Amino acid sequence: MTMGNTQNWRLEGDYFEGCNCDSICPCIFLQDPDKGHCNVVVGWHIEKGHYDSIQLEGLNVVAVFVAPGNMFTGPKMKAAFYIDKRSSEEQVNALSKIFSGQSGGFFAAAANLIGEALGIKTAPITFEMKGRRRRLRIPEFMELEIEAIKGNNTDIDSLVTNPSFTVAPGYDPIIARSSKNTYRDLGFEWDSSGKNGFYSKFKYGP
């Protein structure tokens, strides 16, 4: 089934990410990654969402970005997306339109940073939140676990305020560190455990 693009869509929920940079990742200030490259895994859990009349609540999406250098000045990134296997065909098509940037909004701007799209596939995605911990898993492909870094006052989240770029515009990312960050698919393989992580709420629209 195919569908046209629409400007009538909204997504909101929770997101988190992990990469191979040390905390904190300099990429959010448009700087070069501290290892010369940045491999990023990003997960979203949609609490509320729709694409026209197609409801998207409760679904998960994962993106993998491989940046061989500064992701803003080039060379451009490679990107792959995984959509929740529980999604119907209509939901897969809707989420593909949104996350590929075809329906405008944040992802349309982010698409300018991508030089090669490695595809979109469905997969069973586990997205878990417990306090200041987050866990993301796709069997056989990837696993990411992060926990917020504690500051002097452990009752307050440690934030990056006023970043130049964030996956969730309008929200200051909470600084975290991964206890596990492994990936193996599409010819890539890495273990970036013990490195940078961020998480926050998100809200997107056209």
Can you say where each PLM-predicted feature lies in the sequence?
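Basic/polar N-terminal segments that are highly enriched at the extreme N-terminus
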Residues: M1-N8, Y204-P206
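N-terminal ordered "arm"
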Residues: G4-Y51
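Residues in flexible loops and secondary-structure boundaries
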Residues: C19, I24-F29, K35, D52-I54, ...
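Short, surface-exposed loop and linker segments with low hydrophobicity and enrichment for Pro/Ser/Thr
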Residues: L30-H37, N70-P75, L118-R137, I174-S178
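Low-complexity, flexible helical/coil segments
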Residues: S53-N60, F81, G115-K121, P163-S164, ...
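Charged linear interaction tracts used for macromolecular binding and regulation
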Residues: M77-L159
